[in-house]
Amino acid sequence: MKATHPVLFREVQRFRDVWWVMVLVFGIAALQWWLLLAQLLSGRPVGDNPAPTAILLLYWLLFGVGLPVFFLLLRLEVEVTPNTVLIRYAPLFTRQIAKNEIAGVEPLTYGPLREFGGWGIRGWGGRVAYNVRGNQGVELTLRDGRRVLIGSNDPAALAAALAAARGEPAPATAAPSPAIPPSGS
């Protein structure tokens, strides 16, 4: 990302750093490779209801090659400048939020499965989340009432950069999300 303004905060998170996602992705890929090679090398269709070789090649391209490459390239980049918050879920899309659109900033601990149904780009209950892993982030409340949660490995630094961009004092450290009851209750 090229910035014309000084960068107050920048973080890059990659799905390839989440071991269980990579085990799943490469397990699916390995199965596709095995099916294709078994059918091509033996010259006989694999299984009781085999797919034609052309269909197997298509599946191999999509899941044996495409899926691993996609997950190796997939990353969440967050950049805060004095004027904007840039959220890039590469290679899918980029979202830019101007600082004057932001009404509030709150670092929090959230439940990605319970509140959003998982990780990635998720919309749930009038909120949208951009996250890769973990349960820490910063929620932006926009002037139109929409809420945007940005997952972060360093929510305090992200919140401080957002506050600095808006000319406000840094918010307190991450608090539990309202959807997660405090421990001990």
Model-assigned labels for residue ranges:
Residues 19-24, 45-51, 78-92, 147:
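Short N-terminal helix-initiation segments at or just after the protein's N-terminus
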Residues 47-66:
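Loop-to-helix transition at the N-terminal end of transmembrane alpha-helices
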Residues 62-106:
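Conserved beta-hairpin
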Residues 1-52, 129, 157, 175-185:
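N-terminal membrane-targeting/pre-transmembrane regions
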Residues 2, 79-81, 132-133:
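Short, ordered beta-strand-loop transition motifs
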Residues 5, 12, 87-153, 177-185:
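Non-transmembrane, membrane-adjacent beta-strand/coil modules in membrane-associated proteins
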Residues 22-42, 54-60, 92-102, 167-171:
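Short, charge-rich amphipathic segments
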Residues 150-174:
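C-terminal/domain-terminus segments
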